[in-house]
Amino acid sequence: MPSAPFRRASRDARLAIHAALTAVMAWLAIVLALPTDTFVSSPSFHVMAAMASEDHWAMAFWLVASVGFAGLLTQDGVVRLGSVLVLATMHGVVAGLFALANPATTATGTYGVLAALGYYLAWRRSDEGV
């Protein structure tokens, strides 16, 4: 059985990953909500722009970030697991949309890694009995 300091460090790492996934999603929501015409300025967003406006994407990202915040604030393991799965899935969707728009962008890999981290975190949490 792992020692108490190891379990505490492992819990802190899981919370840090969860917080990072939430913060990146919230940051993307804020960037798209600002009146900067992000979709116009970057060809990497053209697939997202074809699907919905910046404001709609900002609302969707903020909703997902809110689910992440709820998961961070609760002690319920099922809610935490569910929120991480929602965050990881949205990061994966964003990675896929960037890949469709511009495969050479670094955003594809960045959001893909974040999605993988989220799914790893979900696996660890479910493996430990949520």
Regions found by a protein language model. Give the residues of each.
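Short, Lys/Arg-rich, polar N-terminal cytosolic tail immediately upstream
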Residues: 1-10
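Hydrophobic alpha-helical transmembrane segments of polytopic
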Residues: 14-24, 57-60, 64, 80-90, ...
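Hydrophobic transmembrane helix segments
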Residues: 15-59
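Hydrophobic residues within the alpha-helical transmembrane core of Major Facilitator Superfamily
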Residues: 26, 62, 69, 92, ...
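Non-cytosolic membrane-interface motifs at loop->transmembrane helix junctions
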Residues: 45-49, 104-113
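Juxtamembrane helix-break-helix junctions at the cytosolic face
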Residues: 66-80
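Membrane-helix boundary connector in multi-pass membrane proteins
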Residues: 76-79, 85-110, 127-130
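Membrane-water interface at the C-terminal end of transmembrane alpha helices
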Residues: 115-130
